[in-house]
Regions:
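Active-site-proximal beta-strand/loop segments in catalytic clefts of secreted hydrolases
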Residues: 1, 10-13, 22-23, 52-57, ...
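Structured beta-strand-rich core segments of catalytic domains in phosphoester-bond hydrolases
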Residues: 1-48, 52, 56
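Extracytoplasmic/periplasmic, Sec-exported soluble proteins
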Residues: 2, 29-32, 62-73, 97-98, ...
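A short local loop/turn or secondary-structure capping micro-motif enriched for an aromatic residue
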Residues: 26-29, 58-61, 160-162
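Metal-dependent phosphoester-hydrolase catalytic domains
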Residues: 32, 83-91, 99-198
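Extracytoplasmic, non-cytosolic globular domains
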Residues: 38-123
Length: 198
């Protein structure tokens, strides 16, 4: 986007890159384009892994007023998955969705019986990836295929050096900028992670 906050996928050389693409999000009722979804088709041993890196439209103007933007992106991604992946593939969908796991775009549009949102599981590690007015929740999520794989760990990565405490005693991820002010942090979101084996 205009701030240079774009999506990328870094791939270890142990993986073979079979294909890559930028999934365009062209919403006809929006004057401003939103970020592409980065797609990578990888091969590890005999397993095909489809990776989708997302940063969906913000909640600027309010969750309800902006909801249709994220629902549209979810519909585009769902259609891409249905048309371009096979049942034997392992799909790995990650990013900042600017919606929570229970919101329409994720719970009703994207995540069907073939997928599971790991941030909805009771054994997720951490209290959330984002703190909004003192309330932690998951804007940043990892969604995977309902396949035969072994989960090792997943959740939000949080260390003391990444955080700050405000005057109310509330703990937040330390952002880089707040308006024109430089706070020397890395992000107002915590990174999410997943470790698994097939």
């Amino acid at each position: 986007d205009g701030r240079g906050i774009d999506c990328a996928l870094l791939v270890d050389e142990k993986f073979e890159v079979l294909n890559s693409d930028f999934i365009k999000i062209n919403n006809p009722i929006e004057s401003r384009a939103t970020r592409d979804i980065v797609f990578g088709k990888l091969k590890f041993k005999n397993q095909i892994i489809n990776v989708f890196v997302n940063h969906w439209p913000s909640r600027w103007g309010g969750q309800e007023a902006s909801n249709h933007k994220r629902v549209f992106v979810a519909e585009v991604l769902r259609k891409y998955i249905d048309n371009n992946t096979s049942e034997s593939d392992f799909n790995l969908i990650m990013g900042d969705f600017n919606d929570y796991p229970t919101n329409e775009s994720l719970a009703e549009v994207l995540v069907k019986d073939d997928l599971v949102n790991l941030m909805s599981k009771s054994n997720v590690s951490g209290r959330g990836s984002y703190n909004y007015r003192g309330n932690w929740d998951w804007l940043d999520q990892i969604i995977v295929s309902q396949d035969d794989f072994k989960l090792i760990s997943f959740g939000a990565f949080e260390e003391d050096f990444m955080m700050y405490t405000n005057k109310k005693g509330e703990v937040y991820p330390n952002r880089s900028f707040g308006g024109n002010n430089w706070y020397a942090g890395f992000s107002d979101h915590l990174p999410v992670f997943l470790r698994f084996t097939f």
